């Protein structure tokens, strides 16, 4: 029943909500991501891959630790 009432939150809406207090932080983050997407798409992919690989290794390590106990 509830799933039909859920609306997708757009990034612009989040920006509007947060803009009242933290305009400076959002501006810095936005310019940072724009720089990333314009100049370093390969670097962005590499960063995302490294984060994902690290998280995957962490999950495997946690399973091994829980088995040993």
From Swiss-Prot:
GO terms for cellular component: membrane. The keyword Membrane applies. It is found in: Membrane. The chain crosses the membrane at residues 39-61. The keyword Transmembrane applies. It comes from the Eukaryota. Keywords: Membrane, Transmembrane, Transmembrane helix. It is a single-pass membrane protein. Its main location: membrane. This is Putative uncharacterized protein YOR329W-A.
């Amino acid at each position: 029943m509830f799933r039909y009432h859920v609306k997708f939150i757009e990034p612009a809406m989040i920006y509007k909500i947060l803009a009242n207090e933290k305009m400076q932080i959002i501006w810095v983050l936005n310019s940072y991501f724009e720089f990333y997407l314009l100049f370093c798409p390969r670097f962005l992919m590499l960063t995302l891959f490294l984060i994902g690989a690290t998280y995957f290794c962490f999950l495997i390590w946690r399973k091994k630790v829980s088995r040993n106990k």
